[in-house]
């Protein structure tokens, strides 16, 4: 959705949020009657197209400042955690659900956990874990080939979720759950789906009814939390026992839990923090990565010329490994994934057009200014990611699916970048594209998500 050119005040006098344009609303409830949690991003994007890059909306008693101008959005992201923190409801909800980890942590808790989780998910560790991704990708390929041979309909979205659950469980605690081997719904996946939906519902609720009048759905969510929580605690206990018996695992961790437990005593995470971080990884990887891959496939299906070029790239990457390994439909060397620039561009273009986290909500901690507007502490600020990423000032043909825009060669020809740049888009466009966030709290799972997506697409296309 394209938004109009921004109307940013040039006067030196700051205005208050109450003076911002916006959709108005009814007494007491504001625009709550128009609010649908599952469509929140579309509703807010529609208002951004009408009212510009900064506006105010009231939902019930709560006013929210909504921004979609890249530099202001980056200001919010870069000033975390001192200047802005997640929505004030996030940590209480995550803590009571036993999910309090890096995602919900703030201040000193976040500073202590961040380097540990980042190290566990960095390219060096993922290179050691890459065979796990290869195995899961081979299983997905075999499942789809068998379905094709038998003429069985494939539920692509469900299988991609199984795939990401399998990869995440193996990476997180060395357990091969192999949900891809099942045709019926997997119990673990069902519990994770219920928890994921429960988080979204509770964070979007204006009244915490689950605390004093729990519904049947609330009780089912709590049951799923207990079941998965008990399993995760068992994995933690087992990982500790393994490391006591095999000290080498401190230097050569076999999965994420080993890497987290290898921290020295001064940095060590509590069981609750370990539990929260492992649960967060399970939930984050299950939904976001699978949706990105599904959107990429959907967009490719409507562009046969791009599909053909991507297929050629995948076949060439597999052929380059032919001399070092047996013929395989799956890339077996992590370095080979670097030879997939167009496929990576397809993933990035899917994230640009269909971001899996299209908005983020924050609470101001300190007084600041955004686009000439005074932001007081405790002000709720929402950033919208799709409007700037589909703005013609940042991306040519912004509504078109053009993965080649991310390639350095086209950027040089179009004047958007240079042939020597690692990304084919200009600096301004890169600032407008933030699917993994930005600033100090840049998503630690970015590399893993891109790696999984490239592996699945390369295998499927070849």
Locations of the language-model features?
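Cytochrome P450 heme-binding Cys-pocket and its upstream "meander" loop
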Residues: 33, 38-46, 86-87, 267-276, ...
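Conserved cytochrome P450 catalytic core segment spanning the I/J/K helices
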Residues: 27, 33, 122, 224-293, ...
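Cytochrome P450 catalytic core segment centered on helix I
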Residues: 1, 56, 173, 184-265
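Cytochrome P450
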Residues: 58-65, 124-135, 145-170, 178-187, ...
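Central I-helix of cytochrome P450 enzymes
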Residues: 164, 168, 224, 228-233, ...
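Conserved cytochrome P450 K-helix E-x-x-R motif and the immediately C-terminal K′/meander segment
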Residues: 31-52, 230, 234, 329-371, ...
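Cytochrome P450 I-helix active-site segment
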Residues: 18-25, 130-134, 187-194, 245-257, ...
